[in-house]
Amino acid sequence: MVPDLIRNVVGIVGNVISFGLFLSPVPTFWRIIKNKDVRDFKADQYLATLLNCMLWVFYGLPIVHPNSILVVTINGIGLVIEAVYLTIFFLFSDKKNKKKMGVVLATEALFMAAVALGVLLDAHTHQRRSLIVGILCVIFGTIMYSSPLTIMSQVVKTKSVEYMPLLLSVVSFLNGLCWTSYALIRFDIFITIPNGLGVLFALMQLILYAIYYRTTPKKPSTTGPHPRSRIRTSSYQPSPPSPRAPASSPLSARTTTSMAAMSPSISRLSHKLA
């Protein structure tokens, strides 16, 4: 009774952490919506996650593996979230990407239909059904958890953790640890293997982060004063007026010139009158 209670608590915590992981690409898709263009983003990982969620939902059903409701809930939520992501991606993709997505989605649907029919018609016990679907879950779960290996190799080559966010690595580690613990309380090898590998890969990311954090180029600070505020203000101040006489205006200059020109004529007129 106590192990079951602990297992349920751990499973609920795992649901919460996994939900956070499913929501982590939201900023990416918000950017796609704002730009109305997928640009260089790829839908591959979301298509893979969709298939992975479908397999785990099927695995957790009572007709396949009883007492796995917490596996069904989180992967059912993940299935809906991934479907929303792919819908957004489809709406803002070009014809080539839409065609590719359509082919992959149709293939995944046919694959799941074949798995469901094959398991339900051929395997007549929970143990055999769990074995078949569990092996498929391990294969696709391992592929998904090993996807950060490409990013890790990039970190080693560039000696920079710029494209490996610390928070995502920490949450991935906690998620794998939580679900591994869940699987060990009532031993389930099919949940243990992919999540145990997830813990290992996330731990490797954290180690790499600790090694290469100091060698990562720092981004220019955007929290300092506005660039205009750093411009040196002019020290010029108007000088006080000169004690000399003020300059004549154009009007007074013209008046003075006219008076000077008239003075000889006035002198001659005065001489005649005399």
Curated annotation (Swiss-Prot):
It comes from the Eukaryota. GO terms for molecular function: sugar transmembrane transporter activity. Residues 218-274 are annotated as: Disordered. Coiled coil: none annotated. GO terms for biological process: carbohydrate transport. GO terms for cellular component: membrane; plasma membrane. Forms homooligomers and/or heterooligomers. Mediates both low-affinity uptake and efflux of sugar across the plasma membrane. This is Putative bidirectional sugar transporter SWEET7d.
